[in-house]
């Protein structure tokens, strides 16, 4: 089973529409063929329109950084997955550690979002990962497995086959500590085994698993050489055209 690698930039709360267009213009002619590597940028909601228009006709795929689990209604400040689909967005990040931590999103919330995203024909990029405290207590696998089980509750094997899961060790984000490629591979393997236990081998072989935790041009090749790592969810390095291009063109 050969899984198409997927490198997704997560811009977080950075970039305005003008900078977005400048970024796309700088990268769009140098992106790999999507059958070789899928290049994605997940941008703030206020930049999505500019991003989609600028990326039109290129190999750049567009993702949102969040959405709500209802398509419409009295939910001030939320983003509709149905409207994201209508706009041409393909991916939505859910369960990011910043959403879990700062906005107190629970696995139940994330599960509802996953169902709504699939119901609207979009693909979730589901984040999971442990804190330093949990890692130091030796409970990281237990923690991540419990997240995956709760987040995938009620999803079909057909849906999970299309899913992207991003492992982000929270302790390796902005702490100066880095997960080694072996540590990253070990957890990505555990995630794949968990999907196999919950569903079946075929589903586990289809699901694409990214590593997210200080991914940069200097370590992308080493990470992508690992059998269970199918891509990267990239923060800071995705904001600069040159480093983003170095990441998506890591095979060259």
From Swiss-Prot:
Name the pathway: Carbohydrate biosynthesis; gluconeogenesis; Carbohydrate degradation; glycolysis; D-glyceraldehyde 3-phosphate from glycerone phosphate: step 1/1
Q: What does the record list as GO biological process? A: gluconeogenesis; glyceraldehyde-3-phosphate biosynthetic process; glycerol catabolic process; glycolytic process
Q: Where in the cell is it found?
A: Cytoplasm
Q: What reaction does this enzyme carry out catalytically?
A: D-glyceraldehyde 3-phosphate = dihydroxyacetone phosphate
In the UniProt record, which is one GO cellular component term?
Answer: cytosol
Q: Which SUPFAM superfamilies match?
A: Triosephosphate isomerase (TIM)
Question: What EC numbers are recorded for this enzyme?
Answer: 5.3.1.1
| Principal cellular location given in the protein's record | cytoplasm
Task: Note the PROSITE patterns from the entry.
Answer: TIM_1, TIM_2
**Example GO molecular function:** triose-phosphate isomerase activity
Q: Which domain of life is it from?
A: Bacteria
What keywords tag this UniProt record?
Cytoplasm, Gluconeogenesis, Glycolysis, Isomerase
Instruction: Report residues binding substrate.
Output: 10-12, 174, 214, 235-236
Q: Which family does it belong to?
A: Belongs to the triosephosphate isomerase family.
Q: What role is this protein assigned?
A: Seems to be capable of enhancing bacteriocin synthesis. Involved in the gluconeogenesis. Catalyzes stereospecifically the conversion of dihydroxyacetone phosphate (DHAP) to D-glyceraldehyde-3-phosphate (G3P).
Can you name this protein? Triosephosphate isomerase
Q: Which organism is it from?
A: Lactobacillus delbrueckii subsp. lactis
